Design a protein with these regions (language model features):
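Transmembrane and membrane-interface helices of multi-pass
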Residues: 1-159
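Membrane-interface soluble catalytic domains
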Residues: 1-40, 64-76, 262-272, 276, ...
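Short beta-strand segments
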Residues: 278-280, 396-403, 425-428, 452-457, ...
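Small-molecule pocket liners
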Residues: 237-238, 472-476
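Hydrophobic alpha-helical transmembrane segments in integral membrane proteins
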Residues: 147-181
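Metal-dependent active-site segment of extracytoplasmic phospho-/sulfohydrolases and closely related
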Residues: 191-192, 207, 212-215, 430-471, ...
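A long, amphipathic alpha-helix that forms part
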Residues: 135, 168-191, 201-204, 370-392, ...
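Active-site-proximal alpha/beta segments of enzymes that process anionic O-linked groups
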Residues: 58-117, 187, 197-415, 511, ...
Length: 573
């Protein structure tokens, strides 16, 4: 009994609680939620606890007590690590970590672990029965404490499920799938590619050093004087899908909650008769009301409910187990071991998602969309685009790729060569290869001339700053649906002062809607000294601190032309 209780505490603390808390805390960043993954870890936790208890019970005398107390102490140390020693933990954003900056906390953590592990062993040597009884009692107490916390995670989800109307979609079941990712229309197509974290300055370098990357981009215009909208991705992508910016006098939380509600952009595309596929891990609808989330999901062909009956066919159970256990070790082990378990969000999503092989050249329905450019490129080359008529007028696709975002694992040919074995320029060139392949397939299908393609980024290069000292410039390329003669011309460069605010009118014009309600299209922007707005985000390294508005006049790549307006939003309000 003693062994079972202590082993249950060890297993629960290190192998069950961390995955539950990590998934619940990640919210919309992960493709699967707590309701999908909980049985895997409940079963695994019980199995580990029972097997470990049986193994410990085979020991006799001093060996039994030493192993029992060590497991107890290890669990307590992990509990203390999470509770008190993880405040400086680097975020899981894929950026390489200089672990040398954490030497002090590594030393402190190591000392704390040594002390916590040593105390029960020393007491056990002197007072065996006291140490054993104390370990059992504290194990039970900490199981109860952590159990209450885990219960609260499930209670919030259960409350949401029972308060919705019987015929309504449970928003917790909504998943971004690949449905329609490799289909286009024979009638008309409007395609938006978003290359994450890709900057105009980087694109200028590629244009100069590797102009051959754009040989297939005939009929395109490259805009090299671009102001984006907002940074980082969690603000930039939703802007591209709504056209909404924070307003003077409103709380930033109110902006987040209403940006989809007050936008008609996606509705206008849908009402123009275009089937709509949106492929991103940063939709940003989770701040909206449930009714708005259901409405937006209903506009798309690929963002739809996946309940627990569907999840087993989509969830890689073994991959989920080991991926989230790796995350658990990163969180719970002492600092000296964290570099060996470092992870990033897209790695977790890819590890949890079952990669469904194409069947007879067609991607199976309801494969979950994850940010994996290498896998996307492979599927594009093997599956290839196909023409369907699922939209009355045509097809609209919004495809978010990693582009120049770290970690850098793609070479210039789009091949996955392993994490941090590449660099930003090589990886961006790899992304351009993917877009060139997409373009070539459209040309081979005879659909290039009736396809409008806009290529941008959610934001340009940036870092976590207390104050900004350099520009961040999204990229912008555009080709409208046009004559074969114009589509055969080489890519050209234009320096008009454009920004993300010109994306929505350009796309609405492309689907045949009234672009004037959104402003000027890219082609309508004149050569003038207009003021463009940009919204930067300051951070303390853990949380967003403030949203700061800038005016940009002249060349957007020159930070001397960026000036604060004095408008600031508290990102936590």
């Amino acid at each position: 009994v003693c062994a079972l209780i202590v082993c249950a505490f060890f297993s629960f603390t290190l192998l069950v609680v961390p995955p539950y808390e990590i998934v619940a805390g990640a919210g919309a960043d992960l493709v699967f939620g707590l309701s999908d993954i909980w049985p895997i870890f409940a079963v695994a936790g019980v199995v580990v606890a029972v097997v470990l208890a049986l193994a410990v019970s085979l020991l006799r005398g001093r060996a039994f007590d030493i192993v029992l107390l060590f497991l107890f102490a290890f669990g307590v140390a992990a509990y203390v690590q999470v509770l008190l020693l993880n405040s400086e933990l680097p975020t899981a954003d894929g950026k390489s970590v200089n672990w040398g900056d954490y030497t002090s906390i590594m030393l402190v953590s190591t000392v704390v672990w040594i002390v916590i592990v040593a105390i029960p062993l020393v007491v056990g040597h002197l007072k065996t029965s006291l140490a054993r009884g104390g370990a059992v009692a504290l194990s039970l107490a900490l199981i109860i404490v952590q159990g209450v916390g885990v219960g609260s995670l499930f209670a919030s989800g259960a409350f949401e499920a029972v308060t919705k109307e019987p015929d309504q979609v449970n928003v917790a079941d909504l998943r971004m799938t690949e449905d329609g990712l490799f289909t286009v229309s024979e009638k008309s197509n409007v395609i938006v590619f978003v290359l994450d974290f890709t900057d105009t300055k980087q694109m200028s370098q590629i244009m100069q050093e590797h102009p051959e990357e754009f040989n297939d981009w005939t009929g395109f215009t490259w805009y090299n004087n671009v102001a984006g909208s907002m940074v980082p991705t969690r603000y930039g992508v939703p802007f591209l899908l709504t056209g909404q910016l924070p307003q003077q006098g409103e709380l930033f939380s109110q902006y987040l909650a209403t940006r989809y509600e007050r936008s008609t952009y996606l509705d206008d595309i849908h009402n123009a008769g275009y089937s709509m596929g949106i492929y991103t891990d940063t939709f940003g609808t989770e701040f909206s009301s449930e009714d708005v989330q259901r409405h937006v999901a209903g506009l798309t062909m690929n963002y739809h409910p996946m309940n627990q009956e569907d999840s087993p066919s989509l969830l890689d159970q073994e991959g989920t187990l080991f991926t989230l256990w790796k995350c658990a070790m990163y969180r719970d082990l002492p600092w000296a071991f964290k570099p060996y378990f470092w992870f990033y969000t897209d790695e977790v999503n890819n590890g949890m998602t079952l990669q469904v092989e194409s069947d007879d050249g067609e991607v199976q329905q309801s494969t979950l969309y994850t940010m994996n450019d290498g896998a996307y490129y492979d599927k594009l080359k093997t599956t290839k685009l196909s023409a369907t008529d699922d939209g009355e007028t045509g097809a609209f696709r919004f495809i978010h790729l990693l582009g120049g975002h770290y970690p850098f694992n793609l070479d210039e040919n789009g091949n996955d060569i392993g994490t941090d074995n590449s660099d930003a320029i090589r990886q961006i060139r790899g992304s351009l290869k993917m877009l060139s392949e997409y373009i070539r397939q459209l040309k081979d299908m005879g659909l290039y001339d009736n396809t409008a393609i806009l290529v941008t980024s959610d934001h340009g290069d940036w870092g976590i700053y207390e104050d900004w000292d350099s520009s961040s410039n999204a990229i912008m390329f555009y080709k409208p649906a046009q004559s074969a003669e114009v589509d055969a011309q080489p890519i050209k460069t234009v320096s008009t002062p454009v920004a993300h605010v010109n994306v929505q009118p350009t796309i609405i014009q492309a689907v045949g809607g009234d672009s004037s309600k959104y402003g000027e299209t890219l082609a309508q922007v004149p050569f003038d000294n207009r003021v463009r707005k940009f919204y930067t985000t300051t951070s303390d390294g853990k949380n967003d601190v403030s949203i700061v508005e800038y005016d940009i006049t002249g060349w957007a790549t020159d930070f001397n032309n960026w000036h604060k307006t004095g408008a600031i939003w508290d990102a936590q309000q």
